[in-house]
């Protein structure tokens, strides 16, 4: 097949490929052969990097709520602000410290630039915290060296080392706070690797790491500039060129400018990183920081404990939306409204069969479904594991098929339609959705089913139906024959009839045939709607009425009445369709 695409006219000449600006050789890379088997150290930066990107930054109440959420989920390193940059951030850090909100096993992280008055203010903010990470940064990229700082490499290194020395100076003034240092060569992805390694090594030397004293070297994709494999290559390269690697916690801070922040973080972790910074649901500057929810639950789907509790994703999402005043997109992995929802008919059918297979396997093995390996098509994770119900898994619109319709009726109302009845009813539903142009809820689905198969005369639904049972009595004439005495409302006229057959259903069909109809039983099935002693029975019959084949359904606390109602349901549908055809 010939490719018919044509040049777009987009100004590609304005942009230089990343490898031309920052060439390096990693032909001996090892990360592609590695697999993640444990969770990284996590650092949530929602209260700093995430907060600074909000249209309306969080007030103190929302900040505290976010902090409490992160602590409750299990994050042990939480960046809480840039206390030297604003009074609001400073006051919040002091609220955390003085209010006793910081657990002993949680380290708060604060950001600072390499200026003495800013560093001094930073240490004033954290004084008294049990554990603190002082995060020093300065930009190292070729672009910012040229257009922002007008500095050469030596000048940029001097900025970083001056900041490191000042941090050590003010650390001496703290009372009871254990400090860990973090250094970020900001805009790392726009920095030559040799220079990034040089400045990180010199900062590490200034911080005097070793002998039990570790530091964090954070390598931010401040702007995502290349494919994730290139970022991973750079992380493995840096790991080989940091002099005291055993005393360094190598950290990632991916942004999502190219839409591959999660992939960059996952590959960078395989490439030797120890730690990942990000935000819940990917909040952050421009296109956001890497999404900690996606990263954590991706690990869970591979059988790796993320060491973060995502078991109530709805509450996590509600809190994040409240604090950020931004909605979580409906398609956001794991947390969005629609991520466990199937509209496609083939998807719905596969999901339904997957659930049924899990239930069968559990019964055969004598264990609970939760003890089995999760294996349901189109659902990479059990929604229940993150606190979601199965109610929203299948939703019905014009693209839906029998599987989705059948699943909702069974899961919500206990109606277990036979396969051919599923096919017939899905056609009824599709006609409705194509006319309405909208999605059908489970409650609407029940209404459509009731009005099609269970016409009511109590005002709760449609009132059509040529035949309606008013009374039933059966007795066995002999072992082979049953006598049915039935009262029928026929088009508004009451009639009493008696018929015989091998059973009640056969007797009623014989009655219709005796009165000039052509009715034959093709299939019959029944089940109870619940396990309680007073449960109703649901019966389904497939009848040939003349040249039509239709299903009927009946429900009653008495199984005989339910089966006869199902016959009446199918005959009524045949009569209705014949009358509508005659009118056309």
Curated annotation (Swiss-Prot):
Homodimer. The keyword Metal-binding applies. One of its GO terms (cellular component) is cytoplasm. The gene is leuA. This is 2-isopropylmalate synthase. HAMAP family: LeuA_type2. PANTHER family: 2-ISOPROPYLMALATE SYNTHASE, PTHR46911. Residues 456-584 are annotated as: Regulatory domain. Its EC number is 2.3.3.13. NCBIfam families: leuA_yeast, PRK03739.1. It is an enzyme of class 2 (transferase). It catalyses: 3-methyl-2-oxobutanoate + acetyl-CoA + H2O = (2S)-2-isopropylmalate + CoA + H(+). It comes from Kocuria rhizophila (strain ATCC 9341 / DSM 348 / NBRC 103217 / DC2201). Pathway: Amino-acid biosynthesis; L-leucine biosynthesis; L-leucine from 3-methyl-2-oxobutanoate: step 1/4. It holds the Pfam family IPMS_D2.
């Amino acid at each position: 097949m010939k490719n018919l695409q044509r040049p777009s006219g987009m100004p590609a000449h304005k942009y230089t490929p990343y490898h031309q600006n920052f060439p390096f050789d990693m032909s001996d890379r090892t990360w592609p052969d590695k697999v993640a088997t444990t969770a990284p150290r996590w650092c949530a930066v929602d209260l700093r990097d995430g907060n600074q990107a909000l249209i309306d930054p969080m007030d103190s109440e929302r900040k505290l709520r976010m902090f409490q959420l992160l602590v409750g989920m299990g994050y042990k390193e939480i960046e809480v602000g840039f206390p030297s940059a604003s009074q609001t951030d400073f006051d919040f850090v002091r609220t955390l410290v003085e209010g006793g909100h910081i657990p002993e096993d949680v380290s708060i992280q604060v950001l600072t630039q390499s200026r003495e008055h800013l560093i001094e203010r930073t240490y004033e903010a954290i004084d008294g915290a049990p554990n603190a990470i002082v995060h020093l940064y300065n930009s190292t990229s070729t672009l910012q060296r040229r257009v922002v700082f007008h500095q050469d490499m030596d000048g940029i290194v001097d900025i970083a080392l001056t900041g490191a020395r000042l941090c050590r100076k003010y650390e001496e003034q703290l009372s009871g706070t254990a400090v860990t240092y973090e250094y970020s060569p900001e805009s790392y992805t726009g920095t030559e690797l040799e220079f990034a390694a040089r400045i990180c090594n010199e900062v590490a030397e200034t911080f005097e790491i070793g002998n039990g004293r570790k530091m964090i070297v954070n390598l931010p994709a401040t702007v995502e500039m290349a494919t994730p494999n290139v970022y991973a290559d750079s992380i493995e390269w840096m790991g080989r060129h940091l002099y005291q690697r055993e005393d360094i916690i190598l950290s990632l801070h991916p942004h999502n400018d190219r839409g591959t922040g999660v992939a960059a973080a996952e590959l960078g972790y395989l490439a030797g990183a120890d730690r990942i910074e990000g935000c819940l649901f990917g909040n952050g500057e421009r296109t956001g920081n890497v999404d900690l929810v996606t990263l954590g639950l991706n690990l869970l789907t591979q059988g790796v404990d993320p060491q973060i509790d995502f078991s109530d994703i709805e509450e996590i999402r509600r809190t994040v939306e409240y604090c950020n005043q931004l909605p979580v997109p409906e398609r956001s992995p794991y947390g969005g409204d629609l991520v466990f929802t199937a509209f496609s008919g083939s998807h719905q059918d596969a999901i339904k069969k997957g659930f049924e297979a899990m239930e069968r396997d559990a019964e055969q093995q004598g264990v609970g479904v939760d003890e089995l390996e999760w294996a349901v098509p189109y659902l990479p994770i059990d929604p229940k594991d993150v606190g979601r119900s199965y109610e929203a898994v299948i939703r019905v619109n014009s693209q839906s098929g029998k599987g989705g319709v059948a699943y909702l009726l069974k899961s919500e109302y206990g109606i277990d339609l036979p396969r051919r009845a599923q096919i017939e009813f899905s056609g009824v539903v599709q006609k409705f959705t194509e006319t309405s142009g909208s999605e059908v809820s489970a409650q609407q689905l029940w209404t459509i089913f009731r009005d099609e198969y269970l016409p009511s005369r109590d005002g709760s639904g449609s009132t059509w139906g040529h035949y309606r049972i008013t009374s039933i009595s059966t007795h066995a004439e002999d072992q082979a024959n049953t006598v049915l005495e039935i009262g029928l409302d026929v088009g508004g006229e009451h009639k009493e009839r008696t018929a015989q057959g091998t059973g009640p259903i056969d007797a009623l069909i014989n009655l219709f045939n005796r009165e000039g109809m052509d009715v034959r039983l093709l299939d019959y099935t029944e089940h109870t709607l619940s396990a309680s002693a007073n449960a109703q029975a649901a019966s389904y019959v497939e009848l040939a009425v003349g040249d039509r084949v239709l299903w009927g359904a009946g429900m009653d606390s008495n199984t005989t009445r339910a089966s006869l109602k199902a016959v009446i349901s199918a005959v009524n549908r045949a009569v209705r369709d014949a009358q509508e055809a005659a009118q056309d």
